[in-house]
Design a protein with these regions (language model features):
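Short, conserved charged micro-motifs
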Residues: 57-60, 112-115
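Well-ordered alpha/beta subsegment
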Residues: 107-108, 114, 118
């Protein structure tokens, strides 16, 4: 299985999508049996943001490399490895925009899962633009 961070990511604008319905996220340490079920409504080509009321209780550290399964829609789950990119505490200025939580960065993804993620995000962006155009 081929893993890489593609040049496509570097050359494309990092489009972030804020979804109305949450996506299911399952995370665990590499090789561990313990899994954590979480949700995200905020994703991009390079990672996602987990809503987490008490981010200080997040079960991973900034050094942890995590196995992550992200369910984009029913029947479409992608797998990749990620790392904690930043923590937003409830009293942080950034929490006004995002709320408290944890930003997770994709560090390793295979080409098939990456393609699925790009297509999902691009489709969601088009849907949001279409909805805005229909309202206007």
């Amino acid at each position: 299985m081929e893993f890489f961070m593609s040049a496509r990511k570097e050359s494309r604008k990092n489009n972030r999508v804020k979804l109305g319905s949450p996506l299911r996220v399952v995370m665990g340490s590499i090789g561990a049996d313990v899994r954590y079920d979480m949700v995200s409504r905020n994703i991009s080509h390079t990672g996602f943001f987990l809503d987490f009321e008490k981010p200080g209780r997040f079960p991973f550290t900034s050094a942890s490399i995590m196995e992550i399964w992200l369910e984009l829609e029913e029947g479409s789950t992608i797998f990749f490895n990620g790392k904690m990119a930043r923590v937003v505490y409830p009293n942080d200025e950034a929490a006004r925009e995002t709320g408290p939580g944890i930003a997770v960065r994709i560090v390793q993804i295979d080409s098939k899962n990456e393609k699925t993620l790009f297509e999902f995000i691009d489709r969601k962006i088009r849907e949001l633009q279409d909805n805005r155009n229909n309202v206007a």
